[in-house]
Amino acid sequence: MLDHINELPDWISRGLDDLFPNDNSGDSDQSFLKRLELSSVDKKPLRVKLGIDPTGTDIHIGHSILFRKLRAFQDAGHTAILIIGDFTARIGDPTGKSKTRIQLSKDEVQSNALNYLEQLGLGKDPKDSLLDFSIPSRIEIRRNSEWLENLNLSKVIELLSNSTVGQMLAKEDFSNRYKSGTPISLHEFLYPLLQGYDSVAINSDVELGGTDQKFNIAMGRDLQKAFGQKPQFGMLLPILVGLDGARKMSKSLDNIVGINEDSLSMYSKLEKVPDDLVLTYLNLLTNENLKELSSNPREVQKFMALKVTSNFKGIEAAKNAQFNSEKLVLGTKDSLEEIPEASVSNVNFPAKAFYLFSKMEMCSSSSEARRQILGGGVRIDGKKIMDPNLEFHTPDDLIGKILQVGKKKFLRVST
């Protein structure tokens, strides 16, 4: 961990990858510790910004890392500014993209935004939600269409004057596309400026983002200075590696754990996270003391699965998931480690149940699979399935789950 991060309170430093700028000279524009101190002295909570573009429908545990940090600021008495990027989502953040993103309609963005807020806990008890929506002074929900929808051409030109083509092409994603001859639409250059202008509009002190967001957050800092505001600090958190152990967690890569999944499915997936990621998951997704863990790697993995599941589903649901996971093999195996694994890479999705069990060689043929299912001999994660035509849309519907035929045939689905 960087020295300037070590100096921060634990609730801020945990999981933090970078804080910029990091000059602790005492200037509140350059020193976050000084800004934090002034906030306490003046009894003026920091305004902590997190922007989300509702380009999809589901939140996964990788997304939750940023929301957990925002909640930590709320719990410390500061104000969370949750910006719903209903305007910028129609452009699409070009970060990490090798081609221009498809633009979404207003209705699509609005529907996605409502789904996001529900998953974040709007209307729920704070102890059961990712963010605390119960105290008005602790959260502002803003939509950036409030200030971007009616931005006139004069203001757009003023924004554009604060950046250069050279600066934009220095951004890795643009640079790679430019060098390879892949088209870059002019509206994509606007995205970092519009995200930066969000910081001006809400006068943020801190902006949270993934490690891929440094350019955009720095743009916000520059624009705040140009508009006569105290510039924000950028706090960057890691991008969670997915269940495949190789690539970032992403629904399009079928390697996610969704926060809306049932507790047994969540626990089962987490229990099979690659060994080298277990401590990372514990560090980023829980508040557990990493110095007090078992020396047994398998026990640590089960502990991680239990604690992460309990954060989203509650401790009782997590314990039940762990118990039911073990019960799946009661009487046939001594432990879950004895269950063989198999990949669904050779299965064509969407897949019907009878085809799946035949393709995974759990049954000798599709007709046998139909007979077994109709006869009540087939289970998934301990739940009996009776419809041979039950459809699984993507590998993510199955990864981490245990397939069972009869009393002795088990298989755990892997990536």
UniProtKB/Swiss-Prot annotation:
CDD domains: S4, TyrRS_core
GO CC list: cytosol
Record field: catalytic activity: tRNA(Tyr) + L-tyrosine + ATP = L-tyrosyl-tRNA(Tyr) + AMP + diphosphate + H(+)
Gene Ontology biological process terms in this record: tyrosyl-tRNA aminoacylation
Motif placement: 'KMSKS' region: 248-252
Domain S4 RNA-binding residue range list: 351-415
Localization in the cell: Cytoplasm
Keyword Nucleotide-binding: yes
Enzyme class, spelled out: ligase
Pfam families: S4, tRNA-synt_1b
Record-level Gene Ontology MF annotations: ATP binding; RNA binding; tyrosine-tRNA ligase activity
Keywords: Aminoacyl-tRNA synthetase, ATP-binding, Cytoplasm, Ligase, Nucleotide-binding, Protein biosynthesis, RNA-binding
Coiled coil segments of this chain: none
UniProt-listed Enzyme Commission number(s): 6.1.1.1
Motif ('HIGH' region): 54-63
Binding positions for ATP per the UniProt entry: K251
UniProt key word ATP-binding: yes
Family the entry assigns: Belongs to the class-I aminoacyl-tRNA synthetase family. TyrS type 2 subfamily.
Function, in words: Catalyzes the attachment of tyrosine to tRNA(Tyr) in a two-step reaction: tyrosine is first activated by ATP to form Tyr-AMP and then transferred to the acceptor end of tRNA(Tyr).
Subunit details: Homodimer.
Name of the protein in its database record: Tyrosine--tRNA ligase
